[in-house]
C-alpha cells in the first residue's frame, strides 16, 4: 500500500464517544482498530483527504474522507456520519 510522505495519520486515535475504540496507524501503511481487548488489523493508504482501509479478511477495502485539526481526527463513516477521534500519542502494541 502507498504511504504519503507526510503521514499525519500515524499514531493512536481514540474515539471521543467510545474511549475503548481506537484507530492505530503505523508509519509503514499497516495498523489495527482496537476495541476493548480485541483488535482487527488492516493495511491503509493515506490519500491526503481520504484514507483507504482494507481490514485483514475483508473482501473489499473502504475509503473514508477525513480531516485533522488540533489533534482531532474527523472521519466520515459509510453512513456519512462524522466520527470524532482524539490523538493519544504513539500506538500501543
What are these regions (language model features)?
Residues 1-14, 25:
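N-terminal helix-cap/turn-to-beta initiation motif at the start of protein domains
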Residues 15-24, 30-87:
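Contiguous, well-ordered beta-strand patches that form the walls/edges
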